[in-house]
Each structure stands twice: as C-alpha cells, then as structure tokens.
Amino acid sequence: MTLASQIASDLLDIKAVYLKPEEPFTWASGIKSPIYTDNRITLSYPETRTLIENGFVKKIKEEFPEVEVIAGTATAGIPHGAIIADKMNLPFAYIRSKPKDHGAGNQIEGRVVKGEKMVVVEDLISTGGSVLDAVAAAEREGADVIGVVAIFTYELPKAEKNFAEAGVKLVTLSNYTELIKVAKVKGYITADGLQLLKKFKENQETWQD
C-alpha cells in the first residue's frame, strides 16, 4: 500500500473524511459537495498522526532538501508544522490568516530571517486561496517560500490554477482520486456513489445533474 492510499484509508477509518454523494454537504463557498474533511481529527490518533508526520518529513526531504524553516498556517497547520520542525531539527513559525489587531500587529509568529528557504504546512487544499495568502504574508516578511505541503487535496482545477499562477510548488500526502478509490475498495461507497464522486471532481457545479 502506498503512503497516499494508507493515509486515505486512515482518514476514512477515523472519520476525518465523510463521503455522502447522495446527501451532499454545503461548503462555506456555497458549493454542494459529496465530501467533507476535518483533518484536525488526525491529531487525536497517534498512529495516523505519526504516519502523517513521517510522511511529511520524507516528502520535504525529497522535494525541498534545501529547506531552512518550517511554517504552519493558523490554525490547522500549526501542530503538524511544529512536529515536523521538531523531527527535522528546524526553526518553526506560524502564519495568521490576518495580522493581529493589537500589540505589534504580527501576522507571523516566530523569527523569520530574510532569505531563509521556507516550507509552509497546511492540512487541506480546496482552492488553495488561504494558504497562498499565508505564503504571500511570509514573503512580505522576507522568507523565500519554496513550497507548500498538505495532508490532502480535493484536486480542484481552481487550486491547480491558483498554485500555477502563484508559482508555488504543492506537494500533498494523499488526494481525492486515491481516497475515492480506497473508499470503494473498503465499502464506504457504492459503485453509483463512486461515479457521482468522479463527476464532482470533473465539475463542481454540474456533478448532480
């Protein structure tokens, strides 16, 4: 079993991911979606958490060997980022969604040295907008962001476009394609459900038609 399929399996088993193609969820954006993900739950399961953090360390060493600092996005990327930084013996910082409205007004907590090569950690990629905002904030502070890592991606075309336009490399441990494949094998969805889930990936607006 590959790392991507093992993580997909774990996410389903611990109910970090729910698949309901016949009774879709409504995302904050208004999109009707057959999938809902809350990867924060992974922190409560030591075996899954270890699998994820070791996976992150391996991927970062392979894809971004020149990394000098790890940063987590607030709030979901913070615990994973801190664990990764500890395992890799690297400095850690975290990036708020917006600057504090009191005190020094920091958006980044932790020391960012100008020109340091940074990898930003996120738990989930939908459109990529929030993590790319975090990347931009880090770069304004002088960091050289060399990539983003995340546990899971919905593989939405908008995310691919956003990362390409930003010129930021994205590496994820697992993905939507792998997850729905594993879900069918493990009996979490029917054959009809699988077809609906495939249609959602192709077009988020018309998949129910």
Curated annotation (Swiss-Prot):
UniProt xrefs under InterPro entries: OPRT, Or_phspho_trans_dom, PRibTrfase_dom, PRTase-like
One Pfam assignment: Pribosyltran
A GO molecular function held by the record: orotate phosphoribosyltransferase activity
Residues that coordinate or bind 5-phospho-alpha-D-ribose 1-diphosphate: 96, 100, 102, 122-130
Keyword Disulfide bond annotated: no
Tagged with keyword ATP-binding: no
Positions that bind orotate: 126
GO term, biological process aspect, one: 'de novo' UMP biosynthetic process
Reactions performed catalytically: orotidine 5'-phosphate + diphosphate = orotate + 5-phospho-alpha-D-ribose 1-diphosphate
Pathway: Pyrimidine metabolism; UMP biosynthesis via de novo pathway; UMP from orotate: step 1/2
Highest taxon, organism lineage: Bacteria
Annotated keywords: Glycosyltransferase, Magnesium, Pyrimidine biosynthesis, Transferase
EC number(s) recorded for this UniProt protein: 2.4.2.10
CDD domains reported for this sequence: PRTases_typeI
Transmembrane segments: none
Cofactor(s) in the UniProt record: Mg(2+)
Family to which this protein belongs: Belongs to the purine/pyrimidine phosphoribosyltransferase family. PyrE subfamily.
Cross-referenced NCBIfam families: pyrE
Its job: Catalyzes the transfer of a ribosyl phosphate group from 5-phosphoribose 1-diphosphate to orotate, leading to the formation of orotidine monophosphate (OMP).
Subunit structure: Homodimer.
PANTHER family from the UniProt entry: OROTATE PHOSPHORIBOSYLTRANSFERASE (PTHR19278), URIDINE 5'-MONOPHOSPHATE SYNTHASE (PTHR19278:SF9)
Record protein name field: Orotate phosphoribosyltransferase
Species this protein is from: Streptococcus thermophilus (strain ATCC BAA-491 / LMD-9)
Record lineage: Bacteria, Bacillati, Bacillota, Bacilli, Lactobacillales
Gene: pyrE
